[in-house]
UniProtKB/Swiss-Prot annotation:
Protein name: Pentatricopeptide repeat-containing protein At4g30700
Species per Swiss-Prot/TrEMBL record: Arabidopsis thaliana
Record gene name: DYW9
GO biological process, one term: cytidine to uridine editing
Molecular function GO labels: RNA binding; zinc ion binding
Region (Type DYW motif): 698-792
Amino acid sequence: MLLRTVSSATAETTAALISKNTYLDFFKRSTSISHLAQTHAQIILHGFRNDISLLTKLTQRLSDLGAIYYARDIFLSVQRPDVFLFNVLMRGFSVNESPHSSLSVFAHLRKSTDLKPNSSTYAFAISAASGFRDDRAGRVIHGQAVVDGCDSELLLGSNIVKMYFKFWRVEDARKVFDRMPEKDTILWNTMISGYRKNEMYVESIQVFRDLINESCTRLDTTTLLDILPAVAELQELRLGMQIHSLATKTGCYSHDYVLTGFISLYSKCGKIKMGSALFREFRKPDIVAYNAMIHGYTSNGETELSLSLFKELMLSGARLRSSTLVSLVPVSGHLMLIYAIHGYCLKSNFLSHASVSTALTTVYSKLNEIESARKLFDESPEKSLPSWNAMISGYTQNGLTEDAISLFREMQKSEFSPNPVTITCILSACAQLGALSLGKWVHDLVRSTDFESSIYVSTALIGMYAKCGSIAEARRLFDLMTKKNEVTWNTMISGYGLHGQGQEALNIFYEMLNSGITPTPVTFLCVLYACSHAGLVKEGDEIFNSMIHRYGFEPSVKHYACMVDILGRAGHLQRALQFIEAMSIEPGSSVWETLLGACRIHKDTNLARTVSEKLFELDPDNVGYHVLLSNIHSADRNYPQAATVRQTAKKRKLAKAPGYTLIEIGETPHVFTSGDQSHPQVKEIYEKLEKLEGKMREAGYQPETELALHDVEEEERELMVKVHSERLAIAFGLIATEPGTEIRIIKNLRVCLDCHTVTKLISKITERVIVVRDANRFHHFKDGVCSCGDYW
C-alpha cells in the first residue's frame, strides 16, 4: 500500500514537472501574443496560476513582445512577487519606452514591500531614470544603491556611468568609473562612448589608451565602434591606422560595422581612396556601409560619386528605415542629393517621423536653405526637443539670431523644456547679437536648471560674455570651472584676442600647456589672432613655428592669414608679401585681403594696387575689395582713382552691406543706421550730438573726412561722418542711461577713423566707459583713450 502511494506521488510530481517544463518551452518558442495568451489559459487550467517561476517567465516574454500592460496585469495577479519578478517588470517598462512606469514599480518595491532591491533592481531603475531624463531621480537612486552596498556591481556601475554621461555630468561619470574595484569591457566601452557622445574626443581616446596599456581587459568590436568616431573627429590618421592593425590582430576587423567605422575614419582624414578600397571588401554592403561611403564621397568633394552610390542603393531594393535615413541625411552635403532623399521621404511617408524631419531640417540649415528648414519644421506633425534644437541652431548658424531667440521664446511656451544643447545654441545667438541682457537672462535660466555643471554650457557662457563685451565675467566663470576641455581654453584665448588683450591670451595659452591639455589647430588660430590685434610680432612668429615644428600641424589658410595680419599691422609689408610668396599652399583671397588691409593702415598705395589685382582675379564680385582699394586711394588724396574703383563696382552692380549699430537698453535692442531718422527719440538724439559736437570742437576736434566721398563739399562730408550709426547709438545711450553707466554698442562694420576719434573724446567729456564691438574686435574707451592703442 505504501509502495503504491509513493509511486502515485512520484508520477504526479513527474507529470507536474513535465508539464511545467513544457510551458517554459512554449514561452521560448512563442512568437505572438495570442499564442502566449492561450498558454496562459492552460497554466491556469492546470493549476499553475500561482507558480511564480512560470508567471515570471510569462511576464518577461510578454514584455519582449511589447505586451507590457498584459505583463503588468500578470504581475498584479501575483500575491507575493519576489525581487526577480519586480526586476522583470521594471526592465519590461524600460524596454517598451515607459521609463516613468518602471520608476513607479521601483518606488512600489521600496515603499510597499519588505523586499530588498539587488544590484539588478538598481541597474534597471538607473536605466529608467536615464530614459526618463530625470537627473534628480537618478542621483537619488545612485545614493540608495551606495547605502545598500550594491554600487560596486559591474552592470550597475556601467548603467550609472552611462546615466551621468547622458545628463552631461561628465565629472560624476568619471568618479564612478575610477571608484569601481573591477572593470570589465562593458564598463570601459561605456566610458569611451560617454566621452565621445559628449564630444570630448581627446578624453575618449585617452580612456582607450588606458584600456590598451593598463588593463588586462580585452577590447571587443563595441570598443572599436565607440573609439573610431572619436579618432575620426580629431582626424588622427596615424592612431586610426594603429587601431586598424590592432583590430586585425584581435580578430575584430571581420565585423561589418567595424569595417564601416574604418571607412568613415579614412574618409574624414581625407583618405577617400582607402575608404573606397575598404567599401569594395564588402560582399554585400549593408545600408550603414552605404551611408558611410556616401558621406565619405560627399565630404571629400566627390559629389558625382556620392549621387551615383545613392542611386545604386535605391536600385539595390534595400528597404530603408527611418533610422537609416536619419543617419544618411546629415552626412549628405550636396543639395541635389538632399533633394533626392527628401523626395524619397515624401514618397515613402517618412516625414511623419520626427527624427527624419529633424535630420532634414538640420542639413537644410547647414546648406543655408533656411526657408526650406523652417517649412519642414512648421509642417512636422510631431515635434520633439531635437527638432526645436535643430531649428534654433539653424537660425543661429545662418546669422538669424533674432529668429533664433524668437523661436526659443516660443519653445518655452510649448511642452518642451530646454536642455544643454538648446542653451548652448541660444547663448551662441546672444553672443552673435551682442545682447548682454538677454545673455544674462539665459544665464539665470542655467542656474535654475543646474546646467552650469555641463562643460559645454559653461564654455558657451564664457563665449557669450566675451563676445558681449564682459571679458572680466568671462574670466571669472573660466576660473570657477574645475574641469576644462580644449574648447574651453580656446574660447578664453579667443575672448582675450577679441578684446585686444594679447598678453593675457598668451598667459592662458601657456597655462593650458602646463595643465597637460594638448593644443589643437584651432588653439593656434586663436593665439595668432590675439597676437595680431596686440602687435605681438615676435610672439606670433614663435607660436606659428612651434605649431609646425613642435606639434606637427600643417598650417591652414587661416593660420597663414593671421601671420600676414601680424606682420602687416606692424608695418612689415614687404616681409608679409615674401611670407605669402613662400606659402606651401595657394594663398587664397583671405590672405591677400589681409595684406590689402595692412596697405590701408600704412598707406602703401603701390603695393595695394598689386594686391588688389590678385583679389579681383580671385573674387571679382566681392565689393569689399573695391571699397577698401577706393579708401586707400582717398587716403592718398588720389580722388580720381578712388572714383574709378567705385564706378567699376557700381557698373558690376556690387553693393556694400549697409552699416548699422545696435545698443541694448534694458532687454530692448535699438538699431541705428547712418543718418537714421526713425527712432522715436530722434530729436533728442540729434540735439545731444550737437551739444557734444560743440564741446569736441572746443577740445580741438577736426573731422577726419578723407575717406568720405570726394565729389561733395567739405561741409557736406563733415555732415556725412557726423551721423554715422555708432554716434547715433552712443548719443541715445547717453540719453537713456544714468550718468556714469557704461555704454555698450555693436557695429557690423569696422569703426571708421573719425568715429574712433569722436568716441575717445565723448568718453572723456561725459566721463563714461564706452565699449564698442566692431567687425574686427572690441574697443574699450575710457578718459579719452582706447584699449586698442589706435591700432585696429
